[in-house]
């Protein structure tokens, strides 16, 4: 059996509608596994059969406005904005991050699969063509460390 796993590097990439069939034709019996994650975090959000990502209970999501300066108020549990989070398992650095990802999240944890906890409905990137989007996890870490060293 072959396992095909796709990560977050495909936010600007559109696969053909029949990509799974093409992969199965080449490899045979394939199990598809998709997760959302990034190098700077200690967890992966697995995708359920309904196409949603489920965050680890060790992650405190902070959905921010596009500039990353303020929290966005949820509307009936759903909130869309820049994905920030506090990773409670980070132990060699501060666990707070602000990413360049634009997400829609259900903070009430409503998912047809029955799994509880925060549900990420969609993941994309803020359009860097509208301005140079320099907000990213590595920049968050750099700013924190630089601030700690300067102070």
Role assignments for model-derived ranges:
Residues 1-151:
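Active-site glycine/GP-rich loop and adjacent strand/helix microenvironment
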């Amino acid at each position: 059996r072959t396992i095909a796993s796709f990560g977050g590097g495909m936010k600007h990439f559109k696969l053909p509608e029949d990509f799974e069939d093409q992969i199965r034709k080449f490899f045979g019996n394939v199990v598809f596994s998709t997760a959302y994650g990034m190098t700077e975090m200690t967890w992966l959000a697995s995708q359920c059969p309904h196409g949603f990502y489920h965050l680890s209970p060790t992650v405190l999501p902070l959905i921010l406005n596009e500039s990353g300066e303020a929290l966005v108020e949820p509307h009936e549990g759903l909130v869309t904005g820049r994905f920030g989070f506090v990773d409670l398992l980070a132990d060699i650095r501060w666990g707070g991050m602000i990413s360049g990802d634009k997400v829609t999240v259900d903070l009430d944890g409503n998912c047809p699969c029955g799994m509880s906890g925060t549900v990420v409905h969609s993941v994309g990137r803020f359009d860097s063509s509208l301005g140079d989007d320099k907000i990213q996890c590595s920049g968050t870490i750099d700013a924190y460390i630089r601030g700690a060293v300067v102070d």
